[in-house]
Amino acid sequence: MSKAWKLKLLLLLQLLLLSQHDVDSASVISYLPGFEGLLPFHLETGYIGVGEGEKVQLFYYFIKSENNPEEDPLIIWLTGGPACTALSALAFEIGPLTFKTEGYNGGLPSLVSTSYSWTKVASIIFLDQPVGTGYSYSTTPLSYKPSDTGEAKQTYEFLQKWLVENPQFVSNPIYVGGDSYAGIVVPAIVQQISIGNEHGYKPQINLKGYILGNPSTDLDSDHNSKIPYAHRMGLISDELYESLKRTCQGNYVKVDPTNTKCLKLMEDYGKCVSRINEGLILIALCDLASPNPYSGEHGGRSYLQTLVQSDLSLPTPDCYMYRYLLASHWANDEDVRRELHVVKGSIGKWMRCNWDLPYEKDIKSSVPYHRNNSIIGDYRSLVYSSDHDMMVPYIGTEAWIKSLNYSITDDWRPWFVNNQVIGYTRTYANNMTFATIKGGGHTAEYKPEESFMMFQRWISGRPL
């Protein structure tokens, strides 16, 4: 081979390497369609390949702390579902942007800044996980079903590779966080990281703890706690509650079909709560369709979300689901996808929650993971519940925490903001803090200021 050809070949290889680097590297986003002017924070988006042959490409949004990103904690955050996009957390719950619902008259929805973003004091990776969620995709048809344990392994692999690409964050305190169904997966991710660190896998992850909001823990137990919760909140009578307890023996999920008395009482219970918004029992249900989209017969939240995604029955601006419609319009816009550097043709229609994704719920309870994590590592944990959330009632969360038999170091007491009671808290010897948010719903979006104050105090090591 001539010297000239060797030089050409070398140049070609260099170009290929540079091209590959451009594909793998994150993109810094300074402008977003719908937001006026420069973004007032540092946003990156990108993909990281995981699994066999890196066929699974996980999409993420990364926002640097607006305070001191060199030293502030780094959080990897998972949305619930399963298969609800990270954009939900970023735009509706704990991020620095949200959709403007007032005055929308068609076209691309507008984005506005929020006042209580958790990125004011921490850097956050918002991850579209599992594959098939948000903008995450697979380069080939999957030969397996995404699952809880699979998601835990892939999230650990993602974090390792992200830190290799961003070594400046390796020494930052790292936390894993999530809400709703992520309560099943986050403790398993913590265990994966712990095992990896123990085996000396590189990079070592400077894991300090985890954060769970209104977390699912054991789906049957979570559901069973709705009956006593409904009684505590005055949604069912004393007589009905006592009859349910006695006749159904505390099992309201898998009712024996021969127990006709229990089935009849469950019907009576359904009549009492069928028009209650489980996400926040204080607000009205959206009358998008009949029968009630929150009834178990139609899959609850997933049925309501399907209506929004199908455009068959659109919510009005006063409906809490209206912003989800705006998110769908925005995330499916070609200009938006181009600015976010979404791989063209990688997914079809973007959905806030992909309820049709085949998914194996192979972790029946995350309680054993909590136990293991308290033994493996000296981790801090924050578990918070809003007292008006009926999707995952706080009394079920209190029950599984109690089952861990941790000793109490700071007993039940109110916590305050501006001398007002915001909720109640209790701290345990294993560095677990439990907190309630008074008047809140299923996610932080219903009480953004209070949720931020709780997070800010806890992440800085101060008592609530």
From Swiss-Prot:
- InterPro entries listed in its UniProt record: AB_hydrolase_fold (IPR029058), Peptidase_S10 (IPR001563)
Could you state one GO cellular component term attached to this entry?
A: extracellular region
Q: Which cysteines are joined by disulfide bonds?
A: 84-353, 248-262, 286-319
- Gene3D superfamilies associated with the record: 3.40.50.12670, alpha/beta hydrolase
Where found in the cell?
Secreted
Query: Which first-to-last residue range defines the signal peptide?
Result: 1-25
Q: Which family does it belong to?
A: Belongs to the peptidase S10 family.
Name of this chain's protein: Serine carboxypeptidase-like 18
Q: From which organism does this entry originate?
A: Arabidopsis thaliana (Mouse-ear cress)
Q: Kindly list the organism's lineage.
A: Eukaryota, Viridiplantae, Streptophyta, Embryophyta, Tracheophyta
By which gene is this protein encoded?
SCPL18
